[in-house]
UniProtKB/Swiss-Prot annotation:
Name of protein: Sodium/glucose cotransporter 1
Activity regulation summary: Enhanced by the interaction with PDZK1IP1/MAP17; but unlike SLC5A2/SGLT2, PDZK1IP1 is not essential for SLC5A1 transporter activity. Possibly modulated by cholesterol binding.
Source organism of this protein record: Rattus norvegicus (Rat)
Cellular component terms per the entry's GO annotation: apical plasma membrane; basolateral plasma membrane; brush border; brush border membrane; cell-cell junction; early endosome; intracellular organelle; perinuclear region of cytoplasm
Domain notes: The cholesterol-binding site is formed by transmembrane helices TM1, TM7 and TM13.
Amino acid sequence: MDSSTLSPAVTATDAPIQSYERIRNAADISVIVIYFVVVMAVGLWAMFSTNRGTVGGFFLAGRSMVWWPIGASLFASNIGSGHFVGLAGTGAAAGIAMGGFEWNALVFVVVLGWLFVPIYIKAGVVTMPEYLRKRFGGKRIQIYLSVLSLLLYIFTKISADIFSGAIFINLALGLDIYLAIFILLAITALYTITGGLAAVIYTDTLQTAIMLVGSFILTGFAFREVGGYEAFMDKYMKAIPTLVSDGNITVKEECYTPRADSFHIFRDPITGDMPWPGLIFGLSILALWYWCTDQVIVQRCLSAKNMSHVKAGCTLCGYLKLLPMFLMVMPGMISRILYTDKIACVLPSECKKYCGTPVGCTNIAYPTLVVELMPNGLRGLMLSVMMASLMSSLTSIFNSASTLFTMDIYTKIRKGASEKELMIAGRLFILVLIGISIAWVPIVQSAQSGQLFDYIQSITSYLGPPIAAVFLLAIFCKRVNEPGAFWGLILGFLIGISRMITEFAYGTGSCMEPSNCPKIICGVHYLYFAIILFAISVVTVLVISLLTKPIPDVHLYRLCWSLRNSTEERIDLDAGEEEPVEEDPKDTIEIDAEAPQKEKGCFRKAYDLFCGLDQDKGPKMTKEEEEAMKLKMTDTSEKPLWRTVVNINGIILLAVAVFCHAYFA
């Protein structure tokens, strides 16, 4: 292997030690400080300028958002630091196939904006389980889904993001991982708890801009260093580590040579690491679950001013999703070229020396590039970008998780909870989540790092498909009823969780030491498993629904696609269940207009302002105003001109998606 592709930093055996000293200069530190000050300022501005005193205001930003913050926020909530670490790492290990995961989303943001969101808005819901309750009646599906979603957040999103953020801080600052995580979560929680959804969406928009600028600059540096695109394709295939045997260990050749199909998205259906049928069909099922039924994503769309803004926001997000292939996957591959011995290490002893885990160091591909290539000041900017993507993902998840908990679980435990109590419960729940997340970090830390991105995708493949099946059928097949949906979800969950537990018990193995899990269980690629699980769930739901009583149309107006334009009044299936709460006379306060209002103390005023609980000063809404508000919340009309504009853009986006897949296939 020609030594010219190796940077001098790698030849020293104590490479990681040098990296720690990198961000100890004035330029970098001042950039990071300025960045955090700006973020806090934006959060505070959103906190004082929007209504957070109502559940609709805190959780849905009062349905007043325009298209560009929605698009940016969809993108930022999706791209966490797990993407920077995971996508770049998989790129370094196996080429561009993981980029296909990002491009698949181009199709599904269109499906979300054009097919799913209109139904959710007409149903007038805040959370996804709430939609299923209106559609099927009964509470068991709603509670089951809320709990499952919270589990998925903790196991995949929160833990993976925190872990990859910690890798970064550790490489750049040399801080103890737990200290770093504590500081991060404190800042994140502060403006989620105080600001509500508007703060989250505005800070997301700011962070998307910073993320894109920073990663464009880094990609430029990386391609310049490697000598352009042609040289990049050529050198990647030759990026083989120098140390491949160690006394009695000799590593198999396929464990350290780049894959022959590194530059193809579609790979062999049987021997490929990303089989093409799995990438087209299996991944589409996961994308349907993630983009069209996941609380974090849908909540962004529900906060839009009107339907045209939803569609435009989705289209913007689709165009942004073209970028990760070029801004994350390819820089990860370049990192392997520049620091081959470090990133592509195969000997457990070498890997342990470079990144502390024996299974491989591809996870540090992106952080290494930042720390080694960027000049002072810009390096601080890139660290801010990583923190930005981590924090924006976490704030989105914290806000959505507290929405799920407050609206779907807490209201069942405390039937007569006041608006104020709900607001406080939602904020306290965020603190509980943070506690669980920190406790989960050591488990993720010890999960072999080489599997981080695969870990996220595979857990999604085991738990997501039944949810996707139920939502798809709920919207497009009005014959489906509650028993069918419930048992479909339960059976799907049992099959998925048994595969997940088996795989964790045996471990997924690595190239050096394959797992000894029974072939019949773990031998099926997780994307194929998603297809099988989805099919089983769909069949179960349909069969049980056809054997039981259908739901009368009067309960389904505007809840499924075939009845989406009906104007008749809908009798909600859950209408009878929500018995009106008798207000305790001692809870109601007679307000004498003449009596002077008691002045609150300074501390109490500050507390109320901080938590958005001070908004009792405005007049109460009249019945007519409430009806008008309800109409606004469920309105999906569009102006003809803008409808045409967004539709044309949607078609262009789909054409771009097809072209990208074909070009790199």
